[in-house]
Amino acid sequence: GREIMRSLVEAARACPSIEVMEGAQALRLLQDGSGAVSGLLVRHGGQEHVLSAAETVLATGGIGGLYRVTTNPPEARGQGLGMALAAGALIADPEFVQFHPTAIDIGRDPAPLATEALRGEGATLIGRDGAPFMARHDPRGELAPRDVVARAIAAEIAAGRGAFLDCRSAIGAGFPDHFPTVFAACVAAGIDPRLQPIPVAPAAHYHMGGILTDLWGRTTLEGLSAVGECAATGAHGANRLASNSLLEAVVFADRIATRLREGASAARTAQPAPAPPELGAEGLQTLRAAMAADAGVARDRPGLMRLADTIAALEASYGPASEILAARALCQAALHREESRGGHARIDFPATKASAARSFLTLHDLG
């Protein structure tokens, strides 16, 4: 992934037909009289700019920044999803959020990861008393699926027993050589994983839902495509497999580029529009805490109703900011899905229904 990013940035900077606007913030999608997307309103250098485009491609990342503990950059907090909702796009499966079970719990934002490869090498999850606990939750132990391990760790933390990843016997002195990134994160926090267990906690990691697209990246709005984590291609179902998001981003980005290259869209001219409301820093912290408490690894109706009330209060104070719209979509879909499936776990509906069904909604459905 890092090498793909490096080479793409290098190629983009070298391409004379690409203008790079670093530090620009997308504010809203602009539309013509027919509802087709005609460009973007952005803020760059303290000024607002209208960017016209025959085709606008959203690649804004996920929603991890809507949660108090996340592995995502804090800037990735559902803005693309919210902008698409505000423009009338169809959203799919927003309730499905994957939580990485073993973020290193050292108070950093974003939280560094203790990779699953550590458990693959034999590291065990233990409580504060040093006793392993995964066998009590699932016969597959440390190698159970991500959502199962994340819920087990959350339950142990909620019960006051804590959760730690013990790598001392399985990896020991070889830690710095085999897992240098994790080792550096631990040492920076004053933890030597060769000698001490690593404190861990679940963290919002990947959003399986997003802006509905077809197999060529088209959304339900003319002139708008979406790719990467902000898109809902259906490729990940209810629970993404590790590393598949990289494959999805590469494949669907190439398909969008091929489509646009082979079938040039008609030129569009975007008209200026006012900037939408923005969620202030205090409101964002309130939302992140509420999302973590009530739409995390285990959900129930009382918690989701409490979250809906919090979101409504924030919208009354700040207006329909993109983050608020994204959170509303997730909360409503989670309330309506009365089952547990993949990254969506309802403790009041623990069974999985025999027939699978996707969730679809628009801004109109949010009321």
Predicted regions and their residues:
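Short beta-strand to alpha-helix junction loop
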Residues: G1-E10, M21, T70-G78, A103-G107, ...
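Feature captures the FAD/FMN-dependent oxidoreductase FAD-binding
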Residues: G1-H44, H49-V50
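Glycine- and aromatic-enriched mobile tails/lids
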Residues: D32, I126-E142, A152-I153, Y206-M208, ...
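Core beta-strand elements of the Rossmann-like FAD/NAD(P) dinucleotide-binding domain
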Residues: Q47-E55, T220
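Alpha-helix capping and helix-loop boundary segments enriched in small/acidic/polar residues
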Residues: E48, Y67-E75, D109-L113, A117, ...
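Glycine-/small-residue-rich beta->alpha transition segments that form the dinucleotide
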Residues: A53-E55, A59-G64, C230
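An anion/pyrophosphate-binding glycine-rich loop and adjacent beta-alpha core
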Residues: M83, A89-I198, A249-V250, R259-S265, ...
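FAD/FMN-dependent oxidoreductases across multiple families
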Residues: P180-L224
